[in-house]
Amino acid sequence: GPKTATLAEMGAYLRRAEDLGFDSAVSIDHLLMTPPAYACTWLEPVALLSALAGVTRTIKLGTMVLVLPLRNPAYFAKEWATLDLLSGGRTILGVGVGWHEEEFALMGIPHKERGRRMDEMLELVTALWAGDNVTYAGKYYQVKNLTIDPKPVQKPHPPIWIGGGSQPFEKVYGQTVTNIDPVLKRIAKYAKTWVPHSSATADMVTGDWNKIQRFMEEFGRKPGDMTKVYSNFVYVLKKGEKPEVAAPHFKVYSGMDLPYWKEFYLLGEAEELAEKIRAKVAALGGCEQIVLNPLNWSTEQLELLAGEVLPRVAKP
């Protein structure tokens, strides 16, 4: 955002999150500003999480999502394994193919190759984490008898979350996806956890999950092999508070207007938000984790989530 919190402020915030029982904290990854979807820049996630590992105790640290095709596979394998080591095995690797064409042009990587590059990267990076003297001959990446140390603390490797799926308003992201099946096949083949788009409708999520389950069978996996996460930006309104009070916070992140925020993000009082979360979780057929992204570093929103929203979500 326009004012980045200091490491001391971030550490205090996350330690309070630990005290309130939150399980994990994740970072978004963008090399550049990407308006209108996001109207801000982001700290580089691996450097950020390395710093946060030193000022937290138990909370898991991850990305949601890191644009994997922008990285070099061997360098990234070492970089993330180092983070897993420094954090005591607390990392969650959430990855996606990315979408912002300017970022790929800047890195000299053809935008249309990003999906196939990500497939190869997932294969090569996990192989480098699992063993030594790795030989890999892909279209984009080749190594011979390569060993990368250190290995991650978590075995065989940190959990891999993959984000993606159907979504409305492709214009927000500057692209139109005509065939989502390659994305869903990638999720079915490689993901320990699937993270659908926060803006996806219940019907989209249900349709994607049905396809993912069919693709998993093709890869010899069972639906029970994969967990699911619901994620969204959130702003909890206090009793009687108007939605407009959240506008300055949402505008830091998104160039969209208030009706868009109300429809696709979590903006409302506690009971309304709990109902929205329960509905999306039901569309997923249940999920193992809910990731809620407050819009500032104030612990007030954390307290409202822990004290007012999540207990209502958990109600039978």
Residue ranges of predicted features:
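Active-site-adjacent structural elements that line small-molecule/cofactor binding pockets in enzymes
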Residues: 1-316
